[in-house]
Amino acid sequence: AAFCRDLLRRLEGEKGMPQRAFLVEYRLARHGDYEHGSYPAALLDAFVAYLYLIRTCGFRPENIILSGDSSGGNLALALCRYLRDEGVENVPGSLLLLSPWCDVSRSHSGPLPAPNPFSTTVLNNQSDVITASLLYRNSAVCPLLGRLPASETYKNPYISPVSLQLDAQSGVYPPHWGFCGFPRHVFINTGRAELNSEQHVTLAHRMAEGTVSGVPQYSGDCDYSEDRAHNMSWRDQFPRTKGWVSRHD
């Protein structure tokens, strides 16, 4: 919400730029209330909101920039996947992701007893505002999963779209684990001090590799900010973000 408000404030009055935002108050996952906000509650809420924009308000999908930060970035990716797989409506024209949480399984960091020492989850554990501790991770993952088994974080692309245990190219046509059929214009903002920085690189690579008969389908853009922690880099890189928005609005 803060990003959208700041973006609109800075773009106010500029010709050809977005002048309004639609913020979705979706159900949040909460400890001890697995019937209320656990997966797929937020995805269903986002889907209904998207249908409202298109079918009630009359917006065209190609004119929509779908944005999300952190877990909201995870939700934005899940919504694009659902729209692609179900074919109810076209995916939005553009996708803007700020420090998206895209590997809930933590497959990049390796098993807890013997983590990968070169993973940003290990290297950036002291530099990020979030922590790699098991307690912190479970405080977010358990409410999200609800009554689903932990294995869902590894094998469900709606939950962990860049899990290293998923085959990124298993099939050309949906449904599959890859990113064919996603928005053609994608911007990913990340910081080199983030725990999840390597996830964002994997996401950018997998999106760029989305192919049909070997032809690249995406013009992805992954934007790094030096020494910035989780969800803190977009203000530094606002001019570049603004430039991307102006090209794809």
Model-derived segments and spans:
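Short amphipathic alpha-helix adjacent to the substrate-entry channel of hydrolases
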Residues: 2-22
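Short beta-to-alpha linker loops that shape the active-site pocket of alpha/beta-hydrolase fold enzymes
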Residues: 24-29
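Conserved catalytic-core motifs of eukaryotic protein kinase domains, centered on the activation segment
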Residues: 32-35, 108
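Alpha/beta-hydrolase active-site loop
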Residues: 36-57
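Charged catalytic carboxylate motif
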Residues: 45, 74-75, 199
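Alpha/beta hydrolase fold serine-hydrolase catalytic domain that processes acyl esters and thioesters
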Residues: 55-63, 78-249
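Gly/Ala-rich beta-loop-alpha elbow adjacent to hydrolase catalytic centers
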Residues: 68, 72, 76
